[in-house]
UniProtKB/Swiss-Prot annotation:
InterPro entries: Xyl_isomerase-like_sf, Xyl_isomerase-like_TIM-brl, Xylose_isom_bac, Xylose_isomerase. Mg(2+) 1 binds at residues 236, 272, 300, 343. It is found in: Cytoplasm. One of its GO terms (cellular component) is cytoplasm. Homotetramer. Keywords: Carbohydrate metabolism, Cytoplasm, Isomerase, Magnesium, Metal-binding, Xylose metabolism. This is Xylose isomerase. One of its GO terms (molecular function) is magnesium ion binding. Its EC number is 5.3.1.5. GO terms for biological process: D-xylose metabolic process. Its cofactor is Mg(2+).
């Protein structure tokens, strides 16, 4: 039954690349088979509840621009009735888009209670409402998470807070969110440390806070196993914003943290394009490194404005970048429990309800184009064959012996002298490889 928010709009369908209908897919055909799998099963699209339904359109210089029927009126109180209206519209949008998944924070979906118990009870109540909507629509939960960064209690961190009561409150909040995620058959649970870091070292015990973060994550992993949650625990790296320096800076930093606390086999990473850019990396770099380290899990797909210097969370539209990102994902074997979550929001001037649909349609089409280009590159060995040739020397008997530890430094030095080895540089052929990529996109 329609909420009326989107007007008289039918389910978005695939119309092909020649379509000029803004409310149709041009490249995303969910049933199209690419590399042996349906596009829907490759991409596993999810809609982010927070940007689409909770964000009011504000920025640091101005307040709310969006007028949504589920927002409390000026001076009004947020209620469970409004939360359920929001859910009605959300699931209507998921269905219109044909999006198989959604993601949420606890604070996105229920109003804050007068205390922890009331907040948890409200989360349970909306979870029951979600369960009915999920059964009705077939939409599934990709992941749940706790908002441990917006409320003022978390201004100095959650797991890394100097006050142990805040640590305890955060732990209780995460427990309630994991419980709900499990009840809704969520396939992952995400931890993002927006306030886990510091503004100045003058008031920060960095060593202590690292230990607190390690203990917190260990508690989460222990609880996952205790309750039989089969989903994947994911950490989402980000270098800064809102905190000046965040401890989950990038893939390499998080992997070192996981190794330190013996959790590298228990936790994987949810990697966001915009966060990679903030850390000074490309999206494909972070994906390739996570794959190399065995911790790739899921992605938040969006894009940043390259000139602004902050996390703009725009809908993705750079197909060449996305093709290289999905190439790394296919090289990792594709998504297991993860997927493509649109951690993207409208521009604050995009006021119309249809803008929500159009933003996601464009993002889904761009992802489909990127995935299909990546799949063709994999099938044709367009990049893997030159890469294998570049490193072919390591497949020689001597190359394998050096790498396996069968040669000492003295052995290697003696061979260089005896064989009169004088290596000659070889072209990296970067321009050729870039041109090859352009043939596919």
């Amino acid at each position: 039954m329609s909420s009326g928010f989107f007007g008289d709009i039918q389910k978005i369908k695939y119309e092909g690349p020649d379509s000029t209908n803004p409310l149709a897919y041009r490249f995303y055909n969910p049933d199209e088979v690419v590399a042996g799998k349906r596009l829907e099963d490759h991409l596993r699209f999810a809609v982010a509840y927070w940007h689409s339904f909770a964000w009011p359109g504000g920025d640091p210089f101005g307040g709310q621009t969006f007028d949504r029927p589920w927002f409390p009126k000026a001076g009004g109180i947020d209620t469970m009735e409004l939360a359920k209206l929001k859910a009605d519209v959300a699931f209507e949008m998921f269905s219109l888009l044909g999006a198989p998944y959604f993601c949420f924070h606890d604070a996105d979906v229920r109003p804050e209670g007068k205390d922890f118990s009331e907040s948890a009870a409200r989360l349970d109540e909306i979870a029951d409402y979600f369960a009915g909507k999920m059964k009705q629509t077939g939409v599934k939960l990709l992941w749940g998470t706790a908002n441990l960064f917006s409320h003022r209690r978390f201004m100095s961190g959650a797991a890394t807070n100097p006050d142990p009561d805040v640590f305890a409150y955060a732990a209780a909040t995460v427990k309630s969110c994991i419980d709900v995620t499990k009840r809704l058959k969520g396939e992952n649970y995400v931890l993002w440390g927006g306030r886990e870091g510091y503004e100045t070292l003058l008031n920060t015990d960095l060593a202590r806070e690292q230990e607190q973060a390690g203990r917190f994550l260990s508690l989460v992993v222990d609880y996952k196993h205790k309750i039989g949650f089969k989903g994947t625990i994911l950490i989402e790296p980000k270098p800064q914003e809102p905190t000046k320096h965040q401890y989950d800076y990038d893939v390499a930093t998080v992997y070192g943290f996981l190794k330190r606390f013996g959790l590298e086999k228990e936790v994987k990473l949810n990697i966001e394009q915009g966060h990679a850019i903030l850390a000074g990396h490309s999206f494909e770099h972070e994906l390739a490194l996570a794959n190399a380290l065995g911790v790739f899990g899921s992605i938040d797909m969006n894009r940043n404005d390259y000139q602004s210097g902050w996390d703009t969370d725009q809908f993705p539209n750079n197909v060449p970048e996305m093709a290289l990102a999905y190439y790394q994902i296919l090289q990792a074997g594709g998504f297991k429990t993860g997927g493509t979550n649109f951690d993207a929001k409208l521009r604050r001037q995009s006021l119309d309800p249809q803008d929500l649909l159009i933003g996601h349609i464009g993002g889904m089409d761009a992802c489909a184009r990127g995935l299909k280009a990546a799949a063709r590159m994999v099938e044709d060995k367009a990049l893997s064959a030159p890469l294998a040739e570049r490193y072919a020397g390591w497949n020689s008997a001597e190359g394998k012996a050096m790498l396996s530890g069968k040669r000492t430094l003295e052995d290697i030095a003696e061979r260089v002298v005896k064989k009169k080895i004088e290596p000659q540089p070889r072209s990296g052929r970067q321009e050729l490889l870039e041109n090859i990529v352009n043939r596919y996109v």
